[in-house]
Regions:
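A general alpha-helix detector
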Residues: 7-8, 33, 47-50
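Helix-turn-helix DNA-binding elements, focusing on the entry/boundary residues of the two helices
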Residues: 19, 30, 45-48
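Residue-level detection of the helix-turn-helix DNA-binding "recognition helix"
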Residues: 13, 38-40, 49, 53
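DNA major-groove recognition helix of helix-turn-helix/homeodomain DNA-binding modules
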Residues: 46-64
């Protein structure tokens, strides 16, 4: 199953400015992030949890998490 990460890419621009900044936040390399965004490797539960619960503005709600990580193509 492939996911549409358009909303996640916009979220990254707003909150991290660059893919590299987001990769550093997740603790992965930019190549690994690219693989995730191109549906070659899935995001891990740990990575999704980190985004959901570690944002400076507070925890993300389930609707937002769904739109970022689980929107189907």
């Amino acid at each position: 199953m492939e996911f549409d990460y358009t909303n996640l890419r916009e979220f990254i621009k707003i909150n991290f400015r660059t893919l590299k900044g987001f990769a550093v936040f997740l603790g992965i390399g930019t190549t690994q992030l690219g693989q995730r965004l191109s549906n070659k490797v899935p995001f891990t539960q740990k990575e999704i949890d980190k985004v959901a619960n570690s944002m400076p503005d507070g925890k993300l709600d389930m609707e937002t998490i769904d739109s970022l990580f689980f929107k189907k193509k």
